[in-house]
Regions:
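Conserved structural position within tetratricopeptide repeats
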Residues: 457-458, 487-491, 520-524, 554-558, ...
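TPR alpha-solenoid repeat register
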Residues: 432, 465-466, 498-499, 532, ...
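Alpha-solenoid helical-repeat scaffolds
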Residues: 312-493, 497-504
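TPR/TPR-like (Sel1-like) alpha-helical repeat modules
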Residues: 180-205, 609-633, 643, 656-663
Length: 669
């Protein structure tokens, strides 16, 4: 899969005209080639798994850089380039893409490494060095992501030190944003780390630091939305009331801000945020329509919001889906969409976070939220959340339906909604789950759909639901479970479709008697159906009722005289039924149309062998070997017929002798 991905990526990289990206791709391809060569040579490399993970990481990093290069290359109106400038970013970000490229190893080191003493020493040196301004930005971002993946008290304290000591205000604000987000994420475990709580409280004793912390809160509010921030910080206040009391009330008092002024300020922020959101959305739609978005087309609406756009991707700089399951759960977007931890299980908070999508079916999300708020208090979250999540799933899986070859891509891990806490929280009614399951099924996400149908099938007691549930199980090879669902559907009413699916499942598990019964029921509905007649003939062959199968096949041959598949079946059944004349006649028909296969030649060899025409049998068997071009395949087809040949009057020692001659002739080639 990695080699295929690199081959697909190569022309996209060449389009950028960026020599650095081309060199990175060539390096990854060479390393992959060396790895494959060592593997094929039989060399046992204990670090093979680690090397593969590293190459996957480098590939995703390269994809993200190519994506950014395409956007920069094709935005001639300067809008996107201006958006990347730090003074246009709500959350302070790095100065420019070129500088980040030069300092990227620093970011990678801090992000992908566990915060141990050596890396924290490097972090402190970067923070303390005035010449390392860009590296300090990236080190804070990288350490934040590392802490989201793997909690470390020492790493947390190092971020607090950066928020306290750095002489540059933007870097201090960046550190404060990281500290506050980590406080929110790890709210439930802070009571076990009193040193962290004490350090933050001591830091907030300073008026200057409270101003920085308040600025960081504003950054988070502008990025995630007023409603989300209010809910999240209220949740944090439950366990850290002294800290929050130091932060907001004292800041408001020192700045002499009234509650009305604060409300006006929040409304102003929200208005600005919606404008930014709409601008980003239109830009992404334009890029997608011009086929310039090579990587994130499936997130056309969600990824266009400022929550996901370039200035705010400092915590998600690369597509993180290659990370292990536990690591993904620590990244904020995954926590929001999958774990819901940041929202403290508050549904309306999750709805507010999803509001960053922008517009759904032409209606702004803010209108949907207002509409949801007009409902009863207990249902306001569920109404809007269902609308948003249903559309999110439909858009995501519409991409897979239009690009089915990407269903094996690691991106599909993003859509494991049936296993997520969010899914269980939002879709409390069976009717809602039925909508999502139907969407997943029609997008060929059968395993996910089956998980949802399993939750609701017995509750709804619907023939349609049981049918869809059985079909999903059938598609993933769970035939016994599919039959259980179909039998429950049969209790509510029978149909031709149901019999057809049950016959398929019975045949797949080798229950040919029941499969034959289903064929009889199907033929009662459509007696002249050639498809059902052919299915019955196949079942009869499996039951070794060759004479009955041959009668049906002759009928089908009359109806469809030029059907090669039916001719092959007649040849075999006629041979087993000792009707050698008919078998030879149908073989000649195949030979005249040049449609014989290796099995046909084996069958003719059997006929000649039984008729004591050993040389003709030998030549027929050799023709079969030539067509198969593989002795093992030939023997795998020939040897199961030994009992049949003995039953037809050939001694077993003669069968072995013929087999030895064939093997010898193959060895002499």
């Amino acid at each position: 899969m990695l080699g295929h991905a690199l081959a697909i990526l190569r022309p996209v990289v060449m389009e950028t005209g960026n020599a650095l990206l081309a060199d990175q791709l060539q390096s990854i391809q060479q390393n992959y080639r060396y790895l494959v060569d060592y593997f094929l040579s039989g060399t046992n490399d204990p670090r093979r798994s680690e090397l593969i993970d590293a190459m996957i990481h480098d590939t995703y990093e390269l994809v993200d850089e190519v994506y950014l290069a395409h956007r920069l290359q094709n935005n001639t109106d300067y809008e996107f380039r201006e958006m990347l400038r730090p003074d246009n970013c709500v959350i302070p970000t790095y100065p420019d893409p070129e500088s980040v490229d030069n300092a990227d190893p620093t970011f990678r080191t801090m992000w992908l490494s566990k915060p141990d003493d050596d890396h924290l020493l490097l972090f402190r040196k970067l923070i303390a060095d005035p010449a390392m301004e860009i590296e300090a930005y990236l080190a804070i971002s990288g350490l934040t992501l590392s802490l989201l993946r793997s909690f470390s008290e020492k790493g947390f304290l190092a971020l607090i030190e950066a928020a306290e000591e750095h002489y540059l205000i933007p870097i201090r604000e960046r550190a404060w944003v990281s500290v506050l987000l980590l406080l929110l994420v790890y709210d439930d475990r802070l009571r076990f780390f009193p040193d962290i709580v004490a350090a933050v409280q001591d830091l907030l004793d300073s008026d200057d630091q409270r101003v920085f912390a308040t600025t960081a809160m504003v950054c988070i509010v502008r990025t995630l939305g007023v409603d989300w921030a209010n809910k999240a910080f209220y949740s944090l206040q439950k366990s850290m009331t002294p800290l929050i009391n130091k932060l907001m009330p004292k800041t408001m008092e020192s700045e002499k801000i009234s509650q009305d002024e604060l409300d006006d300020f929040s409304a102003h922020l929200d208005k600005d945020f919606q404008e930014i959101l709409e601008e980003n959305r239109q830009e992404m739609i334009r890029l997608t329509e011009e086929h310039l978005d090579t990587h994130f087309a499936m997130f056309k609406d969600m990824y266009s919001s400022s929550f996901f756009s370039e200035p705010f991707r400092w915590w998600l700089p690369y597509d993180p889906d290659y990370l292990p399951e536990e690591a993904r759960k620590q990244i904020p977007i995954f926590r929001i969409l999958h774990m819901n931890d940041l929202c403290d299980s508050d549904r309306f908070a999750f709805l507010s976070t999803l509001s960053r999508i922008g517009f759904i079916n032409g209606q702004s999300v803010s209108e949907l939220m207002e509409q949801a708020g007009n409902e009863a208090e207990d249902s306001e979250a569920e109404t809007g959340s269902r609308i948003l999540c249903n559309d999110y799933v439909r858009q995501a899986y519409r991409f897979f339906r239009l690009n089915p070859w990407k269903i094996q891509n690691p991106f599909d891990a993003l859509f494991q909604l049936p296993d997520s806490t969010v899914f269980r929280l939002l879709y409390t009614s069976a009717a809602d789950k039925r909508i999502i399951a139907s969407c997943l099924m029609h997008c060929r996400a059968y395993e996910m759909a089956a998980k949802i149908y399993a939750q609701i099938a017995d509750t709804l007691q619907s023939a349609e639901v049981y049918g869809h549930y059985g079909l999903c199980l059938q598609k993933i090879g769970e035939y016994e479970k599919a039959l259980e669902a179909y039998k429950k559907m049969q209790q509510l009413g029978s149909s031709e479709w149901l019999y057809r699916q049950m016959e398929y499942c019975y045949f797949a598990i080798g229950d040919y008697d029941d499969a034959l019964q289903m064929c009889e029921l199907l033929l009662q509905i459509k007696p002249d159906s050639q498809a059902y007649l052919y299915e019955k003939a196949n079942v009869l062959i499996k039951l070794e009722l060759f004479a009955e199968a041959l009668a049906i096949l002759y009928k089908l041959d009359f109806l469809r005289p030029n059907n090669v598949t039916i001719t092959h079946e007649i040849l075999w059944c006629a041979f087993v039924c000792d009707d050698f004349e008919a078998a030879i006649r149908y073989f000649k028909r195949l030979e005249e149309t040049n449609t014989t296969n290796a099995i046909d030649w084996i069958n003719m060899g059997h006929i000649h062998f039984i008729q004591d025409k050993r040389m003709d049998a030998y030549q027929s068997y050799k023709r079969a070997m030539m067509q198969m071009a593989d002795l093992k395949k030939f023997l795998a087809a020939f040897r199961p017929d030994r009992p049949l040949l003995v039953e037809k009057g050939i001694r077993l020692d003669e069968v072995y002798l013929m087999e030895d001659q064939l093997i010898s002739s193959w060895s002499e080639k």
